[in-house]
Amino acid sequence: MKNKIEKELLDILKNIVKIDTCYPPGSSKLFSNYVKKYLNKSRLKIKSFGVDKEKINIIASNHSSSKKSLVFNSHIDTVRPILSEWKTNPYNLKIDKKFSYGLGAVNCKGSAAVHLYLAKNLKKLFPNLKSNIDFTFVTDEE
C-alpha cells in the first residue's frame, strides 16, 4: 500500500509525463499551465517567462528576507521518443512494484514531480524556514 506522499508524487508524475514537452519543438506551455494550477494555493510567488509563447519557464519562490537562497531546478523538455523502442505508451506512466516507466520519468520529470510536491507543501513541511527557496522549471535543455 502506498502512503499518501508516494501516491501524490506518482499522481504528479503521471500528470506531467502525459504532457508532451519533446524537443523539438520544445513547447512547455501546457506544462507551465499545469505548474501554475498545481501551485495556485501554495502562497509562493510564481513568475513565468520565455523566449516565445511556447517555451515558457517558471520560477516559484517563497521570497523570505534572508540573504541565503536555495534553488531546486528541473528541466522539463524531453527527447522525442522512438516509439518502436517502447513496449508501452511513453506518455502513460506505467507503475510496477519497483519502477515507474514513462517519457522523462527519470530525466527530469521525476525530479520536477518532487520539486512540485515540495513547493506546494513548503510551509507545512518547514514552518520556520528562513531561507529563500526557488523552484525553477525550465525548458530547452535538450
Locations of the language-model features?
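Acidic/histidine-rich catalytic neighborhood of metal-dependent amide-processing enzymes
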Residues: 108-142
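Acidic/His- and Gly-rich active-site-bordering loop/insert found
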Residues: 2-105, 122-130
